[in-house]
Protein backbone atom coordinates (compact mmCIF):
# COMPACT_ATOMS: atom_id res chain seq x y z
CA UNK A 1 0.00 0.00 0.00
CA UNK A 2 2.78 2.39 0.95
CA UNK A 3 4.73 1.63 -2.24
CA UNK A 4 1.59 2.11 -4.33
CA UNK A 5 0.97 5.50 -2.69
CA UNK A 6 4.56 6.60 -3.35
CA UNK A 7 4.26 5.52 -6.97
CA UNK A 8 1.00 7.45 -7.34
CA UNK A 9 2.51 10.60 -5.82
CA UNK A 10 5.62 10.27 -7.97
CA UNK A 11 3.57 10.14 -11.15
CA UNK A 12 1.02 12.80 -10.18
CA UNK A 13 2.55 16.15 -11.14
CA UNK A 14 -0.57 18.04 -10.13
CA UNK A 15 -0.61 16.57 -6.62
CA UNK A 16 3.12 17.14 -6.20
CA UNK A 17 2.61 20.76 -7.22
CA UNK A 18 -0.17 21.21 -4.64
CA UNK A 19 1.95 19.63 -1.89
CA UNK A 20 4.87 21.89 -2.80
CA UNK A 21 2.75 25.05 -2.69
CA UNK A 22 1.21 24.12 0.67
CA UNK A 23 4.62 23.34 2.18
CA UNK A 24 6.07 26.57 0.81
CA UNK A 25 3.42 28.81 2.35
CA UNK A 26 3.46 26.87 5.61
CA UNK A 27 7.24 27.29 5.93
CA UNK A 28 7.02 30.95 4.94
CA UNK A 29 4.58 31.45 7.81
CA UNK A 30 6.85 29.52 10.18
CA UNK A 31 9.91 31.62 9.30
CA UNK A 32 7.91 34.87 9.48
CA UNK A 33 6.67 34.09 13.01
CA UNK A 34 9.91 32.59 14.35
CA UNK A 35 12.93 34.30 15.86
CA UNK A 36 16.27 33.35 14.33
CA UNK A 37 19.48 33.09 16.33
CA UNK A 38 22.79 32.63 14.49
CA UNK A 39 25.98 31.47 16.22
CA UNK A 40 29.23 31.68 14.23
CA UNK A 41 32.54 29.92 14.85
CA UNK A 42 35.94 30.94 13.46
CA UNK A 43 35.44 34.73 13.84
CA UNK A 44 32.66 34.76 11.28
CA UNK A 45 29.58 36.96 11.27
CA UNK A 46 26.37 37.17 9.26
CA UNK A 47 27.91 39.44 6.61
CA UNK A 48 30.87 37.10 5.98
CA UNK A 49 28.53 34.12 5.96
CA UNK A 50 26.28 35.68 3.32
CA UNK A 51 29.25 36.64 1.14
CA UNK A 52 30.92 33.23 1.02
CA UNK A 53 31.74 32.02 -2.51
CA UNK A 54 32.69 28.58 -3.78
CA UNK A 55 31.95 26.95 -0.41
CA UNK A 56 30.34 23.61 0.45
CA UNK A 57 27.92 23.66 3.40
CA UNK A 58 27.01 20.33 5.01
CA UNK A 59 24.12 19.66 7.40
CA UNK A 60 22.10 16.62 8.51
CA UNK A 61 19.23 15.35 6.38
CA UNK A 62 16.65 15.77 9.17
CA UNK A 63 17.30 19.54 9.16
CA UNK A 64 16.15 20.00 5.56
CA UNK A 65 12.94 21.83 6.51
CA UNK A 66 15.07 24.38 8.38
CA UNK A 67 17.50 24.95 5.50
CA UNK A 68 15.66 27.95 3.97
CA UNK A 69 16.13 29.71 7.32
CA UNK A 70 19.83 28.83 7.27
CA UNK A 71 20.49 30.25 3.82
CA UNK A 72 18.09 33.19 3.54
CA UNK A 73 19.99 36.04 1.90
CA UNK A 74 22.52 33.81 0.16
CA UNK A 75 22.87 34.26 -3.56
CA UNK A 76 23.97 31.68 -6.10
CA UNK A 77 23.28 28.63 -3.92
CA UNK A 78 22.78 25.11 -5.26
CA UNK A 79 21.31 22.21 -3.30
CA UNK A 80 22.30 18.63 -4.08
CA UNK A 81 19.01 16.70 -4.07
CA UNK A 82 18.32 13.03 -4.73
CA UNK A 83 16.02 11.91 -7.59
CA UNK A 84 13.70 10.07 -5.15
CA UNK A 85 10.12 11.15 -4.39
CA UNK A 86 11.08 13.37 -1.45
CA UNK A 87 13.76 14.82 -3.67
CA UNK A 88 11.20 15.76 -6.32
CA UNK A 89 9.18 17.66 -3.72
CA UNK A 90 12.32 19.34 -2.37
CA UNK A 91 13.44 20.16 -5.89
CA UNK A 92 10.33 22.26 -6.46
CA UNK A 93 10.27 23.62 -2.91
CA UNK A 94 13.82 24.94 -2.68
CA UNK A 95 13.37 26.70 -6.00
CA UNK A 96 10.59 28.77 -4.45
CA UNK A 97 13.02 29.85 -1.74
CA UNK A 98 15.56 31.04 -4.31
CA UNK A 99 17.87 28.03 -4.26
CA UNK A 100 18.82 26.18 -7.43
CA UNK A 101 19.10 22.39 -7.69
CA UNK A 102 21.62 19.76 -8.73
CA UNK A 103 19.91 16.38 -8.99
CA UNK A 104 22.01 13.41 -7.93
CA UNK A 105 24.15 12.04 -5.11
CA UNK A 106 27.84 11.95 -4.21
CA UNK A 107 27.61 8.40 -2.86
CA UNK A 108 26.20 6.81 -6.03
CA UNK A 109 29.06 7.63 -8.41
CA UNK A 110 26.83 10.09 -10.22
CA UNK A 111 29.26 11.55 -12.73
CA UNK A 112 26.80 14.17 -13.96
CA UNK A 113 26.09 15.41 -10.42
CA UNK A 114 29.80 15.51 -9.57
CA UNK A 115 30.60 17.48 -12.70
CA UNK A 116 27.82 19.94 -11.91
CA UNK A 117 29.07 20.40 -8.35
CA UNK A 118 32.65 20.99 -9.46
CA UNK A 119 31.54 23.34 -12.23
CA UNK A 120 29.33 25.45 -9.96
CA UNK A 121 32.01 25.66 -7.26
CA UNK A 122 34.56 26.86 -9.80
CA UNK A 123 32.11 29.60 -10.81
CA UNK A 124 31.84 30.80 -7.20
CA UNK A 125 28.51 29.19 -6.36
CA UNK A 126 27.92 27.63 -2.94
CA UNK A 127 26.75 24.02 -2.62
CA UNK A 128 24.61 22.62 0.20
CA UNK A 129 24.58 18.89 0.89
CA UNK A 130 23.17 16.42 3.43
CA UNK A 131 26.00 13.90 3.88
CA UNK A 132 23.85 11.31 5.68
CA UNK A 133 21.20 11.36 2.93
CA UNK A 134 19.31 10.33 1.00
CA UNK A 135 18.57 7.12 2.95
CA UNK A 136 20.80 7.16 6.03
CA UNK A 137 21.81 5.90 8.51
CA UNK A 138 21.02 9.09 10.37
CA UNK A 139 24.03 11.12 11.56
CA UNK A 140 26.42 8.87 9.60
CA UNK A 141 28.35 10.52 6.78
CA UNK A 142 28.07 8.39 3.63
CA UNK A 143 28.87 11.10 1.10
CA UNK A 144 32.03 11.67 -0.91
CA UNK A 145 31.76 15.43 -0.53
CA UNK A 146 34.94 15.62 1.59
CA UNK A 147 36.92 14.18 -1.33
CA UNK A 148 35.60 16.88 -3.65
CA UNK A 149 36.41 19.63 -1.14
CA UNK A 150 39.97 18.35 -0.64
CA UNK A 151 40.72 17.66 -4.29
CA UNK A 152 39.52 21.06 -5.49
CA UNK A 153 40.69 23.00 -2.43
CA UNK A 154 37.22 24.21 -1.43
CA UNK A 155 36.08 25.13 2.05
CA UNK A 156 33.73 22.61 3.66
CA UNK A 157 31.71 24.17 6.47
CA UNK A 158 29.41 22.18 8.79
CA UNK A 159 26.16 23.88 9.77
CA UNK A 160 23.32 22.71 12.01
CA UNK A 161 19.92 24.01 13.05
CA UNK A 162 17.11 23.32 15.51
CA UNK A 163 13.90 24.97 16.60
CA UNK A 164 12.20 25.30 19.96
CA UNK A 165 8.85 24.28 18.47
CA UNK A 166 8.58 21.30 16.14
CA UNK A 167 7.32 17.80 15.56
CA UNK A 168 9.14 14.93 13.88
CA UNK A 169 8.08 12.66 11.08
CA UNK A 170 8.31 8.89 11.42
CA UNK A 171 10.97 8.74 8.72
CA UNK A 172 14.41 7.14 8.90
CA UNK A 173 15.94 10.46 9.98
CA UNK A 174 13.04 11.72 12.15
CA UNK A 175 12.70 14.80 9.91
CA UNK A 176 12.22 18.02 11.89
CA UNK A 177 9.09 19.97 10.94
CA UNK A 178 9.16 23.44 12.52
CA UNK A 179 6.05 24.94 14.13
CA UNK A 180 5.25 28.69 14.09
CA UNK A 181 6.24 31.09 16.89
CA UNK A 182 9.43 29.30 17.90
CA UNK A 183 13.12 30.17 17.98
CA UNK A 184 15.27 28.77 15.19
CA UNK A 185 18.87 28.30 16.27
CA UNK A 186 21.56 28.03 13.59
CA UNK A 187 25.22 27.22 14.31
CA UNK A 188 27.77 27.77 11.54
CA UNK A 189 30.94 25.81 12.31
CA UNK A 190 34.56 26.33 11.29
CA UNK A 191 35.81 25.09 7.91
CA UNK A 192 37.16 21.56 8.16
CA UNK A 193 40.92 21.08 8.15
CA UNK A 194 41.14 18.66 5.23
CA UNK A 195 44.10 16.31 4.77
CA UNK A 196 45.22 13.76 2.19
CA UNK A 197 43.60 10.91 4.17
CA UNK A 198 40.06 10.36 2.83
CA UNK A 199 38.93 8.35 5.85
CA UNK A 200 40.11 11.03 8.30
CA UNK A 201 38.26 13.75 6.37
CA UNK A 202 35.12 11.61 6.32
CA UNK A 203 35.25 10.95 10.07
CA UNK A 204 36.16 14.56 10.85
CA UNK A 205 33.06 15.88 9.08
CA UNK A 206 30.88 13.43 10.98
CA UNK A 207 32.56 14.34 14.28
CA UNK A 208 32.15 18.09 13.72
CA UNK A 209 28.50 17.79 12.71
CA UNK A 210 27.73 15.64 15.75
CA UNK A 211 29.54 18.07 18.04
CA UNK A 212 27.61 21.05 16.64
CA UNK A 213 24.36 19.10 16.95
CA UNK A 214 25.08 18.58 20.66
CA UNK A 215 25.80 22.31 20.99
CA UNK A 216 22.26 23.05 19.80
CA UNK A 217 20.97 21.65 23.12
CA UNK A 218 22.86 24.22 25.20
From Swiss-Prot:
The chain crosses the membrane at residues 14-34, 175-195. Keywords: Cell membrane, Membrane, Transmembrane, Transmembrane helix. Its main location: membrane. To H.pylori HP0270. It is found in: Cell membrane. It comes from Rickettsia prowazekii (strain Madrid E). It comes from the Bacteria. This is Uncharacterized protein RP090. The keyword Protein biosynthesis does not apply.
Amino acid sequence: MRKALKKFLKNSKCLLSIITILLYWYLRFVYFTSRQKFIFYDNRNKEKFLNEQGVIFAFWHNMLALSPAMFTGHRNVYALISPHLDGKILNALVGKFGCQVIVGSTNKNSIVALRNIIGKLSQGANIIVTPDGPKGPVYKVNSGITEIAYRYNKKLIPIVSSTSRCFRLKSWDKLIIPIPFGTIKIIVGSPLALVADKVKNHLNLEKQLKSLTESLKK
